[in-house]
Every structure is written in C-alpha cells, then in structure tokens.
Amino acid sequence: MSVTNILFGNSTPKAETDDQARACLKLLSGRNHMVLTAVALIAPDGREASRLVETRVQFKHLSLQEHADYLAGGEWRGKAGGYAAQGVAGGFIIDLHGSYSGVVGLPLYETLNLLHGLGWVPAGKAVP
C-alpha cells in the first residue's frame, strides 16, 4: 500500500522535522488537497487486484496560534502531509469527499471489496 498527499500537483512528504510540518501546514491551511491511496493485492494463486482511491480534503484557514499549538503537540511526526486526520488535525477538516479511512491509512471499504473479489472469506464464515 502506498499513500501520497497531492497539493497543487506536488507530492507532500511524511513530515519528520518541525520545519517540514510547518511548511505542510502552511500549504494546507485554507485549501483543498487530494489524498491518493493505492492498494494492491496478490492472491496465493497469483491473481492480482488493485485500486486507486481519491479523497478530497478541505482544511480551514489556520491561525498562527493553531499552527504553533499543533506543531508543539508533535502529532504530525511521520504523517503524510504533516497531519493526522484521526487526531487533533481532524478539527481542521471542513469537508472530506471520499474515504476517511484512506486518509488515515487503509481505505477499508475498497480493500475489503478487493479481498472479496479474490475469494477471501472472513474467519468464522462458512465457505459456499
């Protein structure tokens, strides 16, 4: 699985430093961006299935204090785009069209559909 944030045609990295996180937040503040999540699976018999999931995320305009507080909290470390939608930064999201779980990490609905298409049966369920 690969996750990439796209903002104005550019990929945003996983933030590892305060400066990287600050730059990401500055770009995201008050704007829309796309989160693209690719899922690829290979069944034991070699069959393959893949899906690209696109999610549009709209951030509110962040005040200088919100920037400073979020950076001080450290939640952004190692996060694509410098934010964690499942945490404090979820409060910065005005609108989201697509897969919330894809923004957080793994697009569950789409992944389960791929698995079912390859014949996966959940544990405890009878095989027809």
Regions found by a protein language model. Name each.
Residues M1-P128:
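Anionic-ligand binding patches
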